[in-house]
């Protein structure tokens, strides 16, 4: 399409995006996890053990999350470097090294004052647990003046898919982005923490 034209284009490919939006987004995995952990803490108390809501092999499989700021920086990099990234160049973008939920889940739970552990038989799916304990969320929302309808508008099917069904190794090759000089990276759990801080400032989440 761009051949012979004054413009060019780049295709930027993230894996699962972790980030913040001011309204609800059906594919906001970070928001779904945060709502679940907030309700879990309200119901079970600080220090409670939270089993990973997926399968055992999914808990150990590798993946490459993409924090929204890393994605945005790659898109800006491509826009201002058409000589390196144009002509239909395709670039994977992710936080950095691949991770497993065994590395990330305990840290996410710890952020909420909980103890993350591996999958456990008989665990209630995230979306069911939240719906069964909706009053606990409503109490938090009233206490902290949170936005309305967050549970109802959360894309629980997507959150379930990312943690439960998307349970195979998916290592993202970042070598092409690195070869043109894009070296931005972030610790995967830190991407969640920053996103959650932004959600709290926007009255989407209660204090941790």
Describe the role of every protein-language-model region:
Residues 71-160, 165, 173-175, 179, ...:
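Mid/C-terminal beta-alpha module of Rossmann-like enzyme folds, strongest
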């Amino acid at each position: 399409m761009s051949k012979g034209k004054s413009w060019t284009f780049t295709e930027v490919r993230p894996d699962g995006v972790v980030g913040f939006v001011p309204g609800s987004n059906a594919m906001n995995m970070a928001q779904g996890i945060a709502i679940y952990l907030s309700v879990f803490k309200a119901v079970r108390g600080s220090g409670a053990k939270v089993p990973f809501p997926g399968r055992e092999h999914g808990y150990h499989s590798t993946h490459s999350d993409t924090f929204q700021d890393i994605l945005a920086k790659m898109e800006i990099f491509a826009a201002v470097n058409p000589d390196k990234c144009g002509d239909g160049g395709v670039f994977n973008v992710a936080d950095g090294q691949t991770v497993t939920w065994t590395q990330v889940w305990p840290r996410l739970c710890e952020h909420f004052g909980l103890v993350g552990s591996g999958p456990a038989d008989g665990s209630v799916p995230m979306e069911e647990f939240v719906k069964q304990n909706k009053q606990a969320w409503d109490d938090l929302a009233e206490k902290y003046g949170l936005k309305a309808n967050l549970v109802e508008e959360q894309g629980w099917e997507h959150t379930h898919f990312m943690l439960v069904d998307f349970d195979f190794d998916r290592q993202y090759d970042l070598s092409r982005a690195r070869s043109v000089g894009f070296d931005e990276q972030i610790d995967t759990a830190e991407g969640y923490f920053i996103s959650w801080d932004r959600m709290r400032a926007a009255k989407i989440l209660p204090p941790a």
